[in-house]
């Protein structure tokens, strides 16, 4: 959406991308609102479910990381890193600073999405916490397959042992990885396991881990 072309891309543009998009534009919205604008109040059903009143004001939606930046107190010339399953690096700039420039390499440049009346700028990586979760699942496999199916323990003991071991994987890796001097680390990774958000977003890219030797350990890979 951009006001320079009257909102959403034209029907011609969309059908050039894919003929199946014919007629799609006419069924979409025509107007956008920033998240500071109230759109209504809480319905009786949700007020009851949440234990709130129907006087609670409901605002429009926005990107989670953009709202995270608002919560962190983002202002012009400050940089906020919102870290979770992925990472989002968020800044805001005035219209005068941005002008008609399109900032290259970043994944988002949105008028009013972070702070109304300013341009929100977003970069980051598509995988962060998700990568830790993936590596944990890799290391969990033998625990669940071998210990979890062992005949040496009863079912309750197997479940408790597997659960305890799985829960301790990330803390144990963290403690050992902290002991490794940065100059001794020969393992290099491109963290694109979920594609690349910045620079130049490409969600089809894959991650790599290089520099592995027979001496590479789980903490060093971590």
Task: Give names to the regions the model predicted.
Residues 1-23, 33-222:
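Active-site core segments that coordinate phosphate-bearing ligands/cofactors
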Residues 29:
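Thiamine diphosphate
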């Amino acid at each position: 959406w951009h006001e320079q072309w009257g909102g959403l891309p034209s029907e011609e543009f969309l059908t050039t991308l894919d003929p199946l998009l014919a007629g799609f534009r006419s069924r979409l919205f025509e107007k956008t609102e920033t998240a500071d604008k109230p759109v209504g109040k809480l319905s009786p059903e949700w007020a009851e479910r949440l234990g709130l009143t129907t006087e609670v004001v409901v605002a429009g939606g926005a990107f989670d990381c953009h709202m995270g930046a608002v919560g962190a107190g983002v202002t012009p010339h400050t940089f906020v890193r919102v870290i979770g399953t992925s990472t989002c690096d968020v800044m805001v700039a005035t219209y005068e600073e941005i002008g008609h420039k399109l900032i290259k390499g970043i994944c988002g440049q949105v008028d009013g999405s972070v702070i109304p009346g300013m341009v929100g700028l977003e970069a980051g990586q598509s995988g962060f916490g998700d990568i830790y979760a993936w590596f944990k699942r890799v290391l969990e496999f033998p625990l669940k397959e071998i210990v979890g199916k062992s005949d040496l323990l009863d079912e309750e003991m197997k479940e408790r042992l597997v659960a305890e071991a799985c829960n301790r994987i990330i803390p144990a890796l963290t403690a050992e990885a902290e002991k490794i001097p940065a100059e001794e680390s020969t393992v290099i990774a491109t963290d694109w396991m979920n594609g690349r958000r910045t620079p130049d977003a490409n969600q089809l890219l894959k991650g790599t881990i290089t520099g592995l030797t027979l001496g590479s350990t789980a903490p060093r890979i971590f």
